[in-house]
Amino acid sequence: MNLHEYQAKQVLRSSNLNTPRGIAATSADAAADAARELGGEAWVVKAQIHAGGRGKAGGVKVVTSIDAVRSVAAALLGKPLVTVQNAPDGQPVHTVLVEETLPIARELYLSLLVDRASERVAVVASAAGGMDIEQVAHATPEKVLTEICDPLLGVQDFQCRALAFALGLGGDAYKDFCRLLPQLYRVFVANDLSLLEINPLVVTTDNRVLPLDCKMSVDDNALYRRKALADLRDDSQIDAKEAAANAANVNYVALAGNIGCMVNGAGLAMATMDLIQLEGGAPANFLDVGGGATPETVAQGFKIILLDPNVKAVLINIFGGIVRCDVIAEGIIQAVREVGVEVPVIVRLEGTNAELGRTLLAESGLAIVAAESLTQAAKFAVEKAA
C-alpha cells in the first residue's frame, strides 16, 4: 500500500525527523491559507498522487504569490494527472501539498528497500538525485551505491560513513546524513515498509540534509498490525477493480489481456496464466481467491473480473484440497446466475469431489464449459476469447 508524500512526511515527523515545512490542502482557498501560514516569499505546490514523474507532468510548481498558489491548486485539484508512471487516464488529484522552498545546493538519491537476493534491507544511494534512478542505474551503474543491513544491527556507523564519503558529503551535511540514515532504518522497520524512497534528498546552501520528497510503501501483509497506516489508504489512486478486490479481501492484479482468471492459490494462478500464454492467449488479471474459497468469494471474484470491459472469457481453475469442488461448483452456478455473466465461462475442477462438481455444472443448464484438464481449459478459454 502506497502513501501520499504528505502522509509519508507525517510519518517521518512523528519519528522526530526534519522535513520541509508543509501543509496539505484539499481546496484552492485552503492552499492559499496554507501559504499564508507558512510565510515566506515562495512556495512549492505539489499534486498528491501515487505516481512519480509529477514534475514533468506539471504536478509540481514553484510560485511566488498567494494568488499563484490558489490558481495552481485550482488547476490541479479535482482533475486527473497523467505521468509517465501511471495509466493513460492518469490519477485524480484530491490533495495538494503546499511547502516552503529551500535553498538547494545538491540533490541526492536515497532509498531503503527489501532486497530479495539477500533477504535483508538494502540502502541504495546515489549522487545523481532528482531524476529517474532506474535510468541512472542502467546508464551509469557505478553511480548507484548499495549497503546491505544486518537485521540484528541495523545500519551501522561504518556504512553511514562509507555512503556519506561516497556521496561527497562533508561538515554538517556529513553529520546530518550519518544521523538521518539510522533514523530512516528505524522508521522502515517500525512501520513494516517495503520501500522508503527519498528523491531528492537535498543538501541546502547552509549544509543541511533534508528529504525534499518522500515515497513510502507499506507491506500489505502487515497492515493488520498497522491500523494507523491502513487508515491512510486512498483507493481513488488504484485501479477500481483492485479497490474492489481489497474490499473483498482477495488478491487481484489487473493485466492487459482478455481472459479473466479466477484461481485458488497464487502458484496455481501463475501456472494458469502461463498456460493461457502458451496457448496463444493473454490473461486479463491475476485473481487468487485463496485456499479456503467459498461461494461468496467466487461471486465477488466474478464481479471484480467483469468490471474489466476487455474480458471476453473467464477461466476458473480450482483445486479442491481444503475446499470441496462440489461446493465451489454450487458457488459458480449461483454467481453466474446472480451476476448475469454474459461471457463464456470455462471451469476446471480437480481434487475433492471434483467429479460431483463437474456433474453439477453440466446439469445447471448454464453455458458453462467443464474442462477435464488445465491444458484443455486454457485451450477452451483462448478459443472462446478469440
Curated annotation (Swiss-Prot):
Enzyme Commission number(s) from the entry: 6.2.1.5
Gene Ontology terms: cellular component: cytosol; succinate-CoA ligase complex
Keywords from the named record: ATP-binding, Ligase, Magnesium, Metal-binding, Nucleotide-binding, Tricarboxylic acid cycle
Reaction equation(s) it catalyzes: succinate + ATP + CoA = succinyl-CoA + ADP + phosphate; GTP + succinate + CoA = succinyl-CoA + GDP + phosphate
Cleavable signal peptide: none
GO biological process: succinyl-CoA metabolic process; tricarboxylic acid cycle
InterPro entries named in the record: ATP-grasp (IPR011761), ATP-grasp_succ-CoA_synth-type (IPR013650), ATP_grasp_subdomain_1 (IPR013815), Succ-CoA_synthase_bsu_CS (IPR017866), SUCC_ACL_C (IPR005811), Succ_CoA_ligase-like_bsu (IPR005809), Succinyl-CoA_synth-like (IPR016102)
Main enzyme class: ligase
Matches recorded under Pfam families: ATP-grasp_2, Ligase_CoA
Domain of life: Bacteria
Cofactor note: Binds 1 Mg(2+) ion per subunit.
Residue ranges of domain ATP-grasp in the record: 9-244
The protein's annotated pathway: Carbohydrate metabolism; tricarboxylic acid cycle; succinate from succinyl-CoA (ligase route): step 1/1
Transmembrane segments: none
Family: Belongs to the succinate/malate CoA ligase beta subunit family.
Name the record gives this protein: Succinate--CoA ligase [ADP-forming] subunit beta
Organism, as annotated: Thiobacillus denitrificans (strain ATCC 25259 / T1)
Gene (UniProt): sucC
